[in-house]
Structure formats: C-alpha cells, structure tokens
C-alpha cells in the first residue's frame, strides 16, 4: 500500500530561494513580503514504479489534443473522438469537442428529425416533453411575451417556483404565482422559444481558419491584467452564482498566466453586461462560444462545468431557453460525475495556500454547482410532470452547502489571501445557494412522494404481461395522498419546533421557517385523491384538529414577522438574498392562510346547523387571526413583494365572509351567548411600541373596525386590536378564481344587512362568482368553491419514498435551465418600494375613501413609487 504523501516542511518560496522557512501557516518570509505561502506535497523518492496498465492508459489519454474531424453520418451518435456537421450551414467546418456534444444534445432534445435516439433518461424525458409541447403549441395562444430577466431575479424566481409548484401538486388551495398569471415560467418560455439551432452562425468556425466567422483570433488581447482584474471584481460583486468560482484561485492562475481564457471571456462578458456595455459583452460571448470546439469532449473537469453553467445562466435570462437547457444539462452531467468521484475519494490533503487546503476549496465549488444543477433539474421536471426519483443520487444529497464565512473554505481562502473587496456579495451568494439547497431538498422529497398515476395496460395484452402489470400496480399504490400530506406536515412541524428553539437563541433561520409554515398550511388541505384538479371541499371534513393547526400557524406567522421584517430590511441591497426570499415565502404563507379561510367557509356551507354551532367559537378565533394577519400590511416590509395587494385583498375578503357567517348566526338566534371568543391566544410577539430600528411606525394608533360595524360585546369578538394599518387605494389585482384573471368591478352600494352581498364583494373581483345573496346564504359548496383557484391538469406521479437511501444512484444527472420572460427584477418584487398608498376606510373596507390619520393625529406611513 502506497504511503500517503505529506506536506513539505518548507514553503515554495523559501525552498526555491534556499532560505530557512519557519514552517508556520504563513511563514515569516512570506508574511514580511505579503505574498502567498504555499506548501506543496512531498514528491515520492526513488525511481517510480512502472505500471503497464497505467502506461497504456496514459498513452491513450495523450493522444491528439482535439478530436479528429470525422463528419457524423446516418444518425451515428457523436463521442469524444468524432465531430458533427452544423445544422446551420453544412459547408461550415465540422464541429468538434464540447461544441459537437452540445449540437448533438440540441438535436436529440429539439430536432424535428432527431439524428439519434436520446442518449440517456434525462434527454429522453426532455425530448418527450418537447414533443408533447410542440403538439399542443398550435392550439394554444401566446403566453407571456418574450423578454429578459435579471440574474438575481431568476435565482429568486427559481426558489419561489420550487415552493409553489410542489405545494400545487399536493394542496388544494392554489396560490398567486410569483412569476405572474398564466403559464408557469418554464412552460411559458418553452412555448415561446422556437430556436432551430444550437449556435449562431457568427459563433461557428470558418472553413479556412479555426476562428469564428467574423470573429477575432484572440479577443482577450485587448485586456491587460489590471483591466481583467477590475472586470472580475465587477463580476464577483454582481453575479448571484459568484460562489461557484474561487476568486483567490482565479487571480492566482491569472498571475501565473494559466487561467482558462474561455472562462475569463464569459466572466468579462457578464461584467460588461452589468456595466451596460452590451456590445462588448456580446462580442466576448460569441468568442467564448466559438472556443468550445477547442475543449475536448472527454475533458469533464470543473472549469468546463463552470463555463457551460454560466453560458446556460446567460441564455435563460436572455430568452434562449432551448440553448440554456443544453448548456445546463451538459454542465450537470459533468458536475454530477465530479461530485460522485468526490464522494468516493475526497480532494483534501493537497496543496495548502496560506494554511487553506486547495482541494477543500475545489470540493466546495463542486458541491455548490451540484446544488444549483439539482435545483434546476427538480424545478424543470416538476413542471414537465416527469418522474425524477431515479435520477437523484442518494449519497450526494447528504452534503449541504456551507452557510457562514467560517464554514466556507472558499471564503476563508479569500480572507487568508487578503482578497476582501467582494466578500460581502460572495457571502450573499453563498447563503442563497445554501437556501436553494434546502428548498430543493424539500421539493425533491415531496415530489418523489407524490402517488403514481396508475395507467391502464395497453390493449390487447398477453395474459402474462397483464398479470405482471396488475402485480406492479399493487406494488406502486402505496399510501393515499391525504396520508402523505399528513405525514409530511408532521415532519415539517417537528422541524419548525427545532428552528423556533434555535431562533430563541438567535441562531434560527426565519427564511426557512417562513417556507416550512407556507408548505404546512397547504398540506392541511390535500387535493382530490384521484389527482384531478377538482375541488376537494365537497368531501373535506371540519375537525377540531384542523382549527387548532390553522390557529397555531397564525400564531407562528405573527411571531415570525419581526424577524422576517428585520432580515428583509437588512438584506435589501442584495436582491437575491435570503432576506428577500424569506419575505416572498412569508407572502406565500399569508396567501395560503387567506385561501385556507375561504376554504373553511366553503366547507361551512354544507355542514349541518348543529355542526355550525359547534364550530362557531373556533370560527371566531380564525376571524381574529385573519384580522391580525391583515394588520401586518401596515408595515413597509410586506410591500416589497408585488403580490401584496392580491394577498391583502383575499385576507380581508375571507374575514368579511367569516364575519357575515357569525353575524347571520347571531341574528338567527342560533349563536350561544357564551362570552368565550375562542381557545386561540392571539397575544403575539410584536412589540406594543415598535422601535424605529425595526422600520415599523412608532405611533400607537387605535384600530378602526375592520370591514364591519362594531359587534356588541355579547358576540365575543374584541372591539379593538392594537395595530396601525395604512389604507390602500382601490386597484384591481389578481382575481380569486383564477390567478391573473381580472374581472369587472362595480361601485359598492349601501348595505342592507350585515351579510356581505355580491355588491359588497365587487371591490374584490368576486361579484360574478357570488349570487345576489350573501356568502353565508349559499346552500351548497359548489357556489363558493368556484371562488377557489384551480390548477392545471393532473401531473405525473412518482414512486413514494422519504428517506434518502431510497433514491437510486445515477451516473448522469443533467440539469435543465428554464426560459425567460418579459419581467425584470423589479417585476419580481425586488426593491418594489414605491407607489403611494392611499387610505382605505377599514371600518367598511371600501376602497377609495379619504386618507386617514393615526389616533395621535400623525399622518399614516405612505409608500412612494409602488408599481402595481
């Protein structure tokens, strides 16, 4: 057994100059000269042993630098030693290297006449999805107009979409999509993108030279080392994935003139785009793409994965969804292989730079890239309704990214080498990838638990095959969707308790708490067992457990709000930060709560009068909780999410409906005169006098009655709750029945009773869905169930499993990159702090009233520049 190599006792600098080395982490000689102190591994002494097998392998790997230009014919798949003729112009020099591999992948996924069958399970499913999409494209109208998306905006969308799509698979509530109304982001962009080729003609090599047609031989010749360094600073400060590249190692390679020029070109192109110099950025990008033909197809290293991932990220935000999918898929294939190798043989124990193990830094970059790829794969497969469990290597899901600077060897190396200028944005990138990994783990496990859709066997079928089909069907049935939702929610509640204890000691993560609370509310209302998007309220049963869990969720959300507000305000300068994501998850939870209250009202209609009397006190507790949640919109923090108007509108509509039910019960004399309000304790953890440091108004304002006239004390409803709510102007938001559907409104007429009539609901876009009577007068759940949002057709199911060892290892995991949309970062709710908020008289909740003032005479807080 070969002895493991050890680090030298003297650093490289002292050894080359033959001076005494102190042997410290940073020796005295290097510290006095302010240079890096590098300790290499000891070289084995004596004559090396000759291994015939190793020698043979070395001779094979030491072949020609590039693949031989053999044109691929008759649908023969390309490999590392072949090339392929471009589909754009057959007269162009045949493509080689990575460029040829990407061309093959594009034809397999999107070619009208595929040159070969898909080479792996991932591409087979992508190709199948694209064929189904193309078949339905002709019958569908245009979805979201094409446009561009900012880099941080797409990262924020990725995290929100993962949470929304997986809850849509299980829950019956629906949600306001973060992306906006219409198709989901991935499907919408795939419908728009009809690109026929993987590469533009300008990127292809010309027949006479190896340079791209119309391109420069070496575009980087215009950049000296100082200019390159400055552009790298810009890139590190602005790219949300800056944590996948080590700044210290890259600058070290740049000084030694060994840096990969293609990677530099891609990063410089992004830097020019950040500086609004698109012309130079596009030229650099074309040159970088053209150089892919010089990278051998079998060179599956970290640098190649970084190049293709960054190219895919650029293309998805520019609207080239097909090309982005191929770039990211190729990067995912390399990254998964590197991560698997890393799991078997760690890279640690190699060269040390200022005391930091270089192998550990490279391993961390691989793990960061792997989680980005896995997130993109899970995100796209959920929207494609394709099974995913067999593509997830179980052992790779056990290592989560670092969260803080002390835990990150990459950032520790930057500190040790005094590369400090971009540490803050790099830390933000690190925390974003950390959060993305947690969202991905939750979504992947829940999606894998989704019951399989049992299809009928094809006819005719031999009796032997029919028997096997029936037996396999029994094997796959597993647990019901209701049981899966219940078990999953119990697991989430256990995690929530742990996080809340950590938060009490200042170590909790409010963003994850907001995510788990949002998902747990959705899991309270499982979808129909058949998997069809039919409202399940006709069979849903009210229970004491349901009310208790909803009340507990309200308490948790109220207690979490100060932390969410503080983190969102602290991280407002970083648009893709965990603070911004936490705010969006919190809005998702509030949206789910408002829909849950409406769901309870829908079920309430069909229960007997005896049951209604039993649950009245619980319903009053939900009313108090809903009003308390509505009060939170007084604070500026929630107004950074573009969905705040719609969520607020749904909350007050739900509270108005509950109030009408309770008022009607009182008028009919069916309500008990008990003075108990509910078993809910709403003594939440918001300070009675918010401090200016929290960004919350410090004036104590009396609260006007919300939506309804003051009830007598016999009702058991508190007449006032400490709050300060700004009024909002009347604006049409997303309607309740179908997110994004804008319905006509009409002026609200005078009330003739305490029941909310259809005219009362006109301001909330609900009038067309409510009969001329009040909400509580509906005799069956069908009328009110029309208010609830429905989802798109039934998704494909997956095998049930929860524990990681049940994931099947796969050798090739290819991630996918989504297409873009017309929205910008501001449209995603990043930094949306503008537009004045007019007052609304909350006593009747009719929008358009005159501005109100606080109890102490101070003018209520307004937001400027808020766009709808």
UniProtKB/Swiss-Prot annotation:
> Where are the annotated segments for Disordered?
51-88, 662-683, 715-761, 829-868
Per the UniProt entry, what is one GO biological process?
secondary metabolic process
Highest taxon above the source species = Eukaryota
Q: Give the annotated DNA-binding region, as residue ranges.
A: 11-37
Taken from the UniProt record, the cysteine pairs bridged by disulfide bonds within this chain are none
GO molecular function terms listed in the Swiss-Prot or TrEMBL record: DNA binding; DNA-binding transcription factor activity, RNA polymerase II-specific; zinc ion binding
Q: Which UniProt keywords apply?
A: DNA-binding, Metal-binding, Nucleus, Transcription, Transcription regulation, Zinc
Places the protein is found: Nucleus
Q: Report the GO terms under cellular component.
A: nucleus
- Compositional bias (Low complexity) spans? 663-683, 715-727
Keyword Cytoplasm present in the record's keywords: the answer is no
Q: What does this protein do?
A: Transcription factor that regulates the expression of the gene cluster that mediates the biosynthesis of pyranonigrins, a family of antioxidative compounds.
**PANTHER family per UniProt:** ZN(II)2CYS6 TRANSCRIPTION FACTOR (EUROFUNG), ZN(II)2CYS6 TRANSCRIPTION FACTOR (EUROFUNG)-RELATED
Record's protein name: Transcription factor pynR
User: Which organism was this protein described from?
Assistant: Aspergillus niger (strain ATCC MYA-4892 / CBS 513.88 / FGSC A1513)
């Amino acid at each position: 057994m070969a002895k493991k190599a050890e680090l030298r006792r003297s650093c490289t600098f002292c050894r080359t100059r033959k001076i005494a080395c102190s042997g410290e982490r940073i020796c005295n000689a290097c510290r006095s000269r302010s240079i890096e102190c590098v300790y290499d591994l000891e070289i084995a002494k004596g004559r090396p042993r000759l291994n015939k097998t190793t020698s043979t392998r070395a001779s094979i790997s030491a072949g020609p630098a590039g693949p031989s230009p053999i044109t691929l014919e008759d649908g023969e798949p390309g490999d590392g030693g072949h090339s392929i003729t471009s589909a754009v112009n057959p007269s162009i020099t045949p493509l080689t290297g990575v460029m040829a591999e990407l061309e093959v992948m594009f034809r397999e996924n999107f070619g009208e006449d595929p040159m070969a069958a898909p080479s792996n399970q991932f591409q087979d499913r992508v190709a199948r999805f694209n064929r189904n999409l193309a078949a339905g494209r002709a019958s569908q109208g245009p979805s979201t107009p094409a446009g561009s998306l900012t880099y941080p905006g797409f990262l924020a969308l990725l995290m929100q979409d993962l949470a929304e799509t997986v809850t849509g698979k299980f829950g019956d509530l629906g949600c306001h999509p973060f992306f906006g109304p219409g198709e989901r982001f991935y499907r919408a962009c795939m419908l728009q993108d009809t690109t026929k080729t993987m590469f533009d003609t300008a990127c292809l090599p010309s027949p006479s030279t190896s340079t791209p047609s119309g391109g420069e031989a070496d575009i980087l010749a215009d950049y000296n080392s100082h200019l390159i360094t400055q552009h790298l600073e810009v890139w590190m400060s602005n790219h949300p994935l800056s944590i996948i590249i080590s700044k210290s190692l890259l600058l070290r390679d740049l000084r030694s003139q060994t840096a990969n020029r293609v990677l530099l070109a891609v990063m410089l192109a992004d830097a020019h785009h950040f500086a609004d110099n698109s012309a130079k950025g596009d030229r650099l990008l074309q040159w970088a793409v053209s150089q892919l033909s010089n990278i051998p197809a079998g060179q599956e290293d970290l640098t190649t994965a970084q190049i293709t991932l960054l190219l895919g990220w650029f293309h998805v935000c520019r609207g080239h969804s097909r090309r982005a999918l191929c770039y990211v898929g190729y990067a995912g294939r390399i990254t998964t292989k590197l991560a698997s190798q890393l799991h078997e043989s760690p890279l640690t124990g190699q060269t040390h730079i200022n005391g930091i193990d270089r192998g550990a830094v490279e391993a961390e970059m691989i793990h960061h890239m792997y989680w980005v790829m896995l997130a993109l794969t899970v995100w796209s497969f959920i929207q494609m309704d394709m099974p995913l469990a067999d593509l997830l290597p179980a052992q790779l899901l056990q290592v989560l990214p670092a969260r803080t600077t002390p835990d990150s060897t990459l950032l520790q190396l930057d500190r040790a080498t005094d590369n400090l200028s971009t540490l803050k944005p790099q830390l933000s990138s690190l925390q974003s990838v950390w959060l993305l990994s947690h969202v991905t783990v939750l979504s992947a496990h829940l999606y894998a638990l989704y019951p399989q859709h049992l299809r009928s066997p094809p006819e005719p079928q031999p009796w032997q095959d029919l028997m096997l089909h029936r037996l396999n069907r029994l094997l796959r049935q597993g647990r019901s969707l209701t049981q899966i939702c219940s078990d999953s929610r119990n697991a989430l509640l256990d995690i929530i308790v742990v996080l809340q204890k950590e938060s009490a000691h200042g170590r909790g993560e409010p963003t994850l708490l907001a995510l788990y609370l949002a998902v747990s509310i959705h899991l309270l209302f499982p979808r129909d067992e058949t998997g069809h998007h039919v409202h399940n309220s006709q069979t849903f049963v009210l229970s004491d457990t349901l009310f208790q869990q909803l009340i507990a969720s309200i308490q948790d959300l109220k207690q979490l709000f100060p932390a969410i507000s503080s983190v969102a305000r602290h991280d407002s300068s970083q648009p893709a930060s965990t603070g911004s994501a936490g705010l969006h998850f919190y809005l998702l939870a509030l949206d789910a709560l408002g829909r849950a209250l409406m769901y309870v009202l829908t079920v309430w209609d069909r229960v007997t009068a005896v049951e209604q009397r039993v649950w009245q006190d619980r319903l009053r507790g939900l009313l108090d909780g809903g009003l308390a949640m509505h009060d939170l919109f007084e604070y500026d923090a929630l107004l950074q999410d573009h969905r705040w108007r719609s969520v607020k509108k749904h909350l007050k509509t739900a509270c108005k409906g509950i109030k009408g039910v309770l008022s009607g019960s009182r008028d009919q004399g069916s309500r008990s005169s008990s003075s108990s309000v509910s078993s809910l304790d709403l003594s939440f953890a918001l300070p009675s006098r918010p401090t200016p440091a929290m960004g919350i108004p410090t004036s104590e304002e009396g609260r006007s009655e919300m939506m309804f006239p003051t009830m007598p004390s016999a009702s058991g409803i508190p007449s006032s709750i400490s709050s300060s709510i700004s009024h909002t102007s009347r604006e049409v938001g997303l309607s309740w029945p179908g997110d994004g559907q804008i319905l006509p409104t009409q002026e609200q007429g005078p009330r003739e009773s305490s029941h909310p009539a259809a005219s009362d609901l006109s301001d909330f876009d609900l009038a067309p869905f409510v009969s001329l009577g009040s909400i509580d007068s509906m005799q069956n759940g069908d009328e009110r169930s029309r208010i609830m949002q429905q989802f798109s057709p039934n998704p494909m199911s997956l095998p049930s499993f929860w524990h990681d060892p049940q994931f099947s290892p796969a050798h090739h995991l290819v991630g996918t990159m989504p297409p873009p949309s017309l929205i910008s970062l501001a449209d995603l709710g990043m930094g949306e702090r503008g537009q004045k908020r007019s007052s609304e008289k909350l006593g009747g909740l009719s929008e358009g009233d005159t501005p109100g003032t606080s109890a102490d005479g101070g003018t209520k807080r307004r937001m400027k520049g808020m766009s709808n």
